[in-house]
Amino acid sequence: MSRVKRSVTAKKKRRKIFKLAKGFFGARSRLLRTATEAVNRALNYAFRDRRVRKREFRKLWIARINAASRAQGLTYSRLIDGLRKSHVEIDRKVLADIAVNDPRGFSEIVLLAKGETVS
């Protein structure tokens, strides 16, 4: 049976780890074991936080909508309920954007949620 030299495979593996660890501080970008641990941890955090990001943005949108709707004299939950009853299908992302960038348009949406006619 012939002998298998692993230098090509090992170098490829090391290069991959060091490429992922580029920009890390100190030994985390220079030593293989430390870099491997740092890369694995970073990838785990990235995986987790891609899911957390969705939650965080939804919380931010709700906070912005709530603040803008309370300024109009309506709570967030009553606003969402009113929009659902008046068959207005605007998602929270767009609603928060309207609340921040177009206060006049948002006040018209609040009137729709209250069940009043928009002039």
Curated annotation (Swiss-Prot):
Gene Ontology terms: cellular component: ribonucleoprotein complex; ribosome
Molecular functions per Gene Ontology: rRNA binding; structural constituent of ribosome
The keyword DNA-binding is annotated on this UniProt entry: no
InterPro entries (UniProt xref): Ribosomal_bL20, RIBOSOMAL_L20_CS, Ribosomal_protein_bL20_C
Protein's name according to its UniProt entry: Large ribosomal subunit protein bL20
Function: Binds directly to 23S ribosomal RNA and is necessary for the in vitro assembly process of the 50S ribosomal subunit. It is not involved in the protein synthesizing functions of that subunit.
Alphabetic keyword roster: Ribonucleoprotein, Ribosomal protein, RNA-binding, rRNA-binding
Gene3D superfamilies per UniProt: 6.10.160.10, Ribosomal protein L20
Pfam families, A to Z: Ribosomal_L20
GO biological process, one term: translation
